[in-house]
A protein has these predicted regions:
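N-terminal export signals
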Residues: 1-5, 10-33
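Conserved PLP-enzyme active-site core in the AAT-like
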Residues: 12-15, 19, 35-55, 59-67, ...
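Generic N-terminal amphipathic, Lys/Arg-enriched alpha-helix
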Residues: 54-63, 74-81, 337-339
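Short glycine-rich or small-residue beta-strand-to-loop segments that form or flank ligand, phosphate
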Residues: 63, 78-81, 105-111, 147-149, ...
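Conserved N-terminal alpha-helix of the aminotransferase class I/II PLP-enzyme fold
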Residues: 70-112, 123
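General small-molecule cofactor/ligand-binding pocket signal
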Residues: 108, 165-169, 325
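Structural signature of PLP-dependent enzymes
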Residues: 290-313
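Conserved C-terminal alpha-helix-loop-beta "cap" of PLP-dependent enzymes
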Residues: 317-417, 422
Length: 426
């Protein structure tokens, strides 16, 4: 009975994937005919340099160049590139527009979330005092300690480079007890109830709090939510879900702190954050990205993303022993995500093996697996994050960065890789 039931389930899965398999066969036939006629793959600006493009199922990782900009963003940057403008005036004007959109006191465009972290830290230490701005990263005579809620991260160098000293705290009680006359800021990437408690502590102790929610959009309402919660400063990456310029970010919050962050940043000569330059194109592009999100039908977009990973799911489920599930993370990168699992030990085929084979494909396919190629090895060895790391038991494919049509290529290739591994183990 078990064998019959298993065969029946396999047949049903194969039947569900039949239309997709037919599309793949037709596409392969066309590709072979094109090659026979001497029509090769289309060249692009990267291939002409000898750089291979990637089918990105991993998500908005910086080392894979983040996300793809909204068409509106590309057009806005093109228009912005045709004029000269005073950058301080532009940032303040954009700040007023960001305030209208979000309810925050003001905002500036930064060089990513890391740039926002640095600018916010400098603002809390030096304020708008030019003598202190020029003095950084020497913090003599300034409040210079930053309480790190939850401990260290791979990104805290953005805070340390301003001259700030990190003070690690892993609970609300530790945060409160860590605050003293030298405390300049509290940093957190916590959400929900934890964030509410931390906001309350910051208000009670009169210490500014910076929330780093780099991957917090979508939903775009988060840009308003943190203002409603009274978070002093909060930041988003421009090159992740926001779909703005990859080298941009948004720092929003109290008007006085945002002005101080601006004065500690480019274009001001002598400011510690001067190297973290953003151009007029990035400033306009990042603002346009946020405006575009407020006009976007998120339900429709999520439906499109779900369709893409559902096609991949139907194809890979035709391989015996493969199981799948779909979920949306609740702590950032909130996109429909496909989990694919198999018995690694029985197959003699690990998550790393699968990710490696997909990365060696033509075209290259990147998935979430066991590795992080962009991490400085010393960070891993130092284990700055207190969370226990477990060996992964699945790969993940993130829908948001899969371009329309690529799901068929991914589904076909992943199916072939898993089928070959299953047959070898059988």
């Amino acid at each position: 009975m078990t064998g019959n039931g298993s065969s029946r389930r396999s047949f049903v899965k194969l039947l569900a994937a039949a239309p997709l398999l037919s599309q793949i066969a037709a596409r392969d036939l066309y590709a072979n005919a094109s090659m026979a006629m001497g029509i090769g793959a289309k060249q692009n600006i990267y291939s002409r340099l000898g750089v291979k493009t990637v089918i990105n199922c991993r998500g908005t990782w910086t080392y894979l160049s983040g996300s793809l900009e909204f068409p509106e963003v590309r057009q806005a940057q093109l228009e912005a590139s045709e004029y000269f403008v005073n950058m301080l005036e532009l940032q303040r004007a954009v700040g007023r527009r960001l305030s209208e959109l979000t309810g925050a006191g003001s905002g500036i465009v930064t060089s990513g979330s890391a740039g926002a972290m640095a600018a916010a830290t400098a603002a809390c230490m030096a304020g708008t005092n030019d003598q202190l701005i020029w003095q950084l990263p020497d913090t003599t005579g300034m409040k210079h300690e930053v309480v790190m809620a939850g401990g260290r991260s791979a990104f805290d160098s953005a805070i340390r480079l301003t001259g700030a000293k990190l003070v690690l705290a892993h609970s609300p009680e530790e945060i409160a007890n860590s605050i003293n006359e030298n405390t300049a800021m509290i940093y957190t990437n916590d959400l929900g109830e934890k964030l509410e408690k931390e906001v309350a502590i910051s208000k009670d102790r009169k210490v500014p709090l910076l929330l780093d929610d780099a991957a917090g959009i979508p939903p775009v309402d988060n840009a308003k939510l943190y203002a409603r919660m009274g978070v002093d400063m909060y930041c988003f990456s421009g090159g992740k879900g926001l779909r703005g310029p990859q080298c941009s970010g948004l720092l929003l919050g109290r008007k006085d702190l945002i002005e101080a962050a601006l004065l500690n940043s480019s274009p001001r000569e002598g400011a510690v954050c001067r190297p973290m330059k953003v151009g007029k194109e990035e400033v306009i592009g990042c603002l346009t990205a946020l405006e575009t999100w407020f006009k976007t039908d998120e339900k429709k977009l999520y439906a499109e993303w779900n369709v893409r990973i559902d096609k991949i799911r139907k194809l890979v489920e035709t391989v015996p022993g493969v199981t799948t599930s779909t979920y949306v993370p609740d702590d950032g990168n909130r996109y429909p995500t496909l989990r694919v699992t198999w018995d690694q030990q029985a197959w003699g085929f690990s998550i790393s093996d699968c990710a490696r084979e997909l990365r060696a494909s033509d075209p290259i396919i990147e998935v979430l697996g066991a590795d992080n190629p962009s991490l400085v090895t010393a960070v891993r060895e130092g284990n700055p994050n207190s969370k226990v790391r477990k060996a992964p038991d699945h790969i993940e494919l993130v829908s948001m960065t899969i371009k329309p049509g690529e799901e068929m290529i991914v589904g076909q290739r992943l199916r072939a890789v898993l089928a070959a591994a299953w047959k070898k183990a059988a």
